[in-house]
């Protein structure tokens, strides 16, 4: 995930908040890995003669099942992040919230099958 030069913005915060939200809404830990540095694309026939560059902003992280950060990477250094989770506790937390209690896949399962639609 990088900052798009055309948009002149830094999407790191938005990306991180979205991923933390996925962790919290599904009550599962999320590990988000990203690379660092500038990558350039030189013009060639395969890319239609376009030249571009994208700066990857690192910021890899690990969030627990509530979305809280438990490991945090930097923007410009290669790193290995680790975290340990008590999976029984994670499961207990997920069950106590009842997040999936009201799911009714038998009502919508047909539209999730390959080649099917609404």
Where are each of the predicted segments found?
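Short, surface-exposed linear patches
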Residues: 1, 20-24, 84-85, 93, ...
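Cysteine/selenocysteine-centered motifs that mediate thiol-based redox chemistry or coordinate metal-sulfur cofactors
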Residues: 90-118
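A sequence-level detector of short, solvent-exposed, charge-rich linear segments
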Residues: 38, 42, 49, 85-89, ...
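CN hydrolase (nitrilase-like) catalytic-core segments centered on the catalytic cysteine
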Residues: 1-81
């Amino acid at each position: 995930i990088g900052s798009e030069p055309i948009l002149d913005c830094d999407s790191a915060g938005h990306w991180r908040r979205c991923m933390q939200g996925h962790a919290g809404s599904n009550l599962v830990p999320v590990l988000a890995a990203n690379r660092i540095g500038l990558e350039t694309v030189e013009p060639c026939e395969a890319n239609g003669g376009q030249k571009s560059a994208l700066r990857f902003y690192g910021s890899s992280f690990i969030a627990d099942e509530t979305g809280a950060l438990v490991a945090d990477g930097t923007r410009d250094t290669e790193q290995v992040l680790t975290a340990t989770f008590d999976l029984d506790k994670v499961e207990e937390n997920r069950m106590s919230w009842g997040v999936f209690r009201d799911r009714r896949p038998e009502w919508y399962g047909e539209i999730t099958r390959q080649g099917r639609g609404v």
